[in-house]
Amino acid sequence: MRSWVLLSLVLAGCAPTVAETRQADARQAKSDAKLARALQGLTPGPAQTCLSSIDRRNARIETYGSTTLYRVGRDRVFRNDMNGGCGTNTIDPIYVTQTPSTQLCRGDIAQLIDRASRFPIGSCAYGDFVPYTRAR
């Protein structure tokens, strides 16, 4: 009986507080609003499984929570919704990816490295790459 009480106290200490949940929700809403502004005026196309190395090398990379945008010029953006533990609204990690080919493809793993400590802090898998283009 005593161990059950102790276990319930330990588990209760691990649960997020109401304030922490509200802060996380506010950060997510802010990130979603920034993402919507970044894609404003762009039209999504059919999803692609891979992003060529040419597009990737010429891209400016922006992250919004678990979504990564590869901005190739003014009129073309590739959106990737990462799977796994890449939803970071509080830190700006370094993404390290080792690919078996010259393309970055769905299912490739990205390891997250903390900029300050240079220690690994997580990993996740890339999803489909959705091209967004500006209507002319």
Regions found by a protein language model. Give the residues of each.
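Sec-dependent signal peptide recognition
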Residues: M1-L7
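A residue-level signal for beta-strand positions that form part of recognition/binding surfaces
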Residues: S8, V77, S123-Y126
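C-terminal motif of bacterial Sec signal peptides marking the signal peptidase cleavage site
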Residues: L11-G13
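N-terminal secretory signal peptides
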Residues: P16-R79
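Helix-rich interaction surfaces within compact, conserved domain-sized segments
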Residues: N83-R136
